[in-house]
Amino acid sequence: MTDGEKTLAEYVYSASGNPVVKKIGGNITSTYAYDELLNIKALKTETEKQTLADNHYFYDGNGNQIRREGLEGTTGYAYDGRNRLTEISYPSALGGYTEKLGYDAAGNRIRRETEQEITTYRYDNCNRLQELRREYKNTETSTAQPEMIRYTYDRQGNMLR
C-alpha cells in the first residue's frame, strides 16, 4: 500500500492466505507463525533497534486459546463445556487481575466481573442487548455511580443506541 510516493505498508502472505510478514512505514515489522491448524502460534513485532512485542500462543484440543506468553508475562484463558470464554488471568505487568465471564442458556454474555467492577447484560426475546449495567465494587475510593446504558432497535433490528 502506498500513498503515491512511498510505501506505507507491505504484506507477505503464506500459500494458505495468512499474513506472515507485515511492514509498516518501513521501520516496523511484524512476523507471524502458524501451527498445522492455521492458529497463530507466534507474533513478533520489532523495529531495527527494539522488540515491541514477542507473543507465543497455545491452544486446547478444541482450538481455544488457553495461554499467551509475551514480554509482559503470561495471560491465561479458561472455557466452559460449550467453549465459551469464562476467565482471563492477566499478568502483573498488565495489572495482575482476573476477569470472569458468565452466560445465559442462549450463549449471551450476562456477567463480567473483575476485582474493581461488575458488569451485567440484559437481552430481549430476540437475544438483542437491551441494557448494560456497570457497578463499581470499591465505593470507598470510587465516587462513581453505577453506569447504565439502554439500547434500542429499529424495526429491521438495527441498533439505534
Regions found by a protein language model. Name each.
Residues M1-D3, T7-I24, I28-E69, T74-S92, ...:
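Beta-strand elements of repeat-based all-beta scaffolds
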